[in-house]
Swiss-Prot record:
Underlying gene: Ywhab
Lineage of source species: Eukaryota, Metazoa, Chordata, Craniata, Vertebrata
Keyword Acetylation: yes
Record's protein name: 14-3-3 protein beta/alpha
Quaternary structure (record): Homodimer. Interacts with SAMSN1 and PRKCE. Interacts with AKAP13. Interacts with SSH1 and TORC2/CRTC2. Interacts with ABL1; the interaction results in cytoplasmic location of ABL1 and inhibition of cABL-mediated apoptosis. Interacts with ROR2 (dimer); the interaction results in phosphorylation of YWHAB on tyrosine residues. Interacts with GAB2. Interacts with YAP1 (phosphorylated form). Interacts with the phosphorylated (by AKT1) form of SRPK2. Interacts with PKA-phosphorylated AANAT. Interacts with MYO1C. Interacts with SIRT2. Interacts with the 'Thr-369' phosphorylated form of DAPK2.
PANTHER family on file: 14-3-3 PROTEIN
Modified residues (N6-acetyllysine): 5, 51, 70, 117
Species name: Mus musculus
Amino acid sequence: MTMDKSELVQKAKLAEQAERYDDMAAAMKAVTEQGHELSNEERNLLSVAYKNVVGARRSSWRVISSIEQKTERNEKKQQMGKEYREKIEAELQDICNDVLELLDKYLILNATQAESKVFYLKMKGDYFRYLSEVASGENKQTTVSNSQQAYQEAFEISKKEMQPTHPIRLGLALNFSVFYYEILNSPEKACSLAKTAFDEAIAELDTLNEESYKDSTLIMQLLRDNLTLWTSENQGDEGDAGEGEN
């Protein structure tokens, strides 16, 4: 039995409340594959679903990678760690490729508003970034390049079409700066991008409308937290606090 769009959206909302994000993602994938432009609510449901689905694997991957490094003296344990990490990597890659296919086949093509276009291009940058975290060699270069390209395109549209206080423009600056810091190892560029986004938003705080006030100020706080972390002397810590945007 095929469900219509409103039933699938309702199913996604139920799954979100039950914290069953795989079900939520499957429902929103089916909505997207119907080929219509998504409403803001549907777009956010899709984003939240996949962010949680991929986030669980990214977190598992980090834990296992760290354990693997600590078991270097024990070959058997290390082999087990490696095999388990590769299993998680395969899941993570499948999820990212699913999202990237939805973006290229439906979402970016169907986006009529600049806001949607930026949202989806940012998402494309994010999921190529997640792929690059677990990639190596030539594959790593390709995913890094694709990520940067998507972020850059989104960034240019956002500067032209959106207020500096818009939560989507701020969220893009946040993640693009994390990309520079973590993936390209360019702390100067990361700090410059984050600082400019923060300063431009501060200068136009009076343009903030009530509905996005909370989202925008939360992302501004994350930008500032990352700047503090990145400019502090002990740069050994990961700057991944910059993933808390909506």
